[in-house]
Amino acid sequence: PAGNGRKYSVNGLDDDGNVDCRLHPLWGHSVALNYGFVFDECNRDAIKPKAFMFAAEGATAAGVAAQVEAAQVESGGFRDGDLATVLAGTNDIIEIYQRFPGESADALTALAAERGAQLARAVNRLVELGAKVIISDVPNVGLTPYALKERALHTDTDRAALLTRLTTAFNQQLGVTILLDGRFIGLVQADLQFRAIAQSPGGYGFVNVTEGACTVALPLCRDDT
């Protein structure tokens, strides 16, 4: 707790109210920290970075493919022992969903499946270039506060169910297209975990799984935060 009796760390803030990325690391940061590595983007202690960030705001499956090629060039090539972490697809699902009802649910489901396969091909490309990969599938977008709001706003169909359908199609093709033989790629089944949490939140220590945690736009983090 801070001197004013408030605890800022739960919001990712230090005692002075400044954003501190170390308090709530992204999962990629946590993986890197497990090996004693830091990213330049979250390096308030000025340690020499040995982990490198190629993620981009709003990236889709197509964007990840471009990021893979950029990482190959900027790193001078992947080497044995290099590990890449990948989580993408939510932006694809939202973009595809927003085409409804102009395009049919069946057509959009097929498109979501193709995007999942596209992301898988980008992951397989990482393996081809020499990296090992940990990839997470997409947590069910149909369980998000956004989905629940969309369901309340529209009466043409269950919009949350449609978002779940798109998520499932994406994840299924991702899972069957990646080179999943136990040697090169580890698949994090985040979707199953999030569905279990939504089904029985109390069992996982959650009280509220329907409302957004952030009611205002998040701050843009600087390299030192």
Regions from the language model: what does each represent?
Residues 1-225:
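Conserved active-site regions of diverse hydrolases
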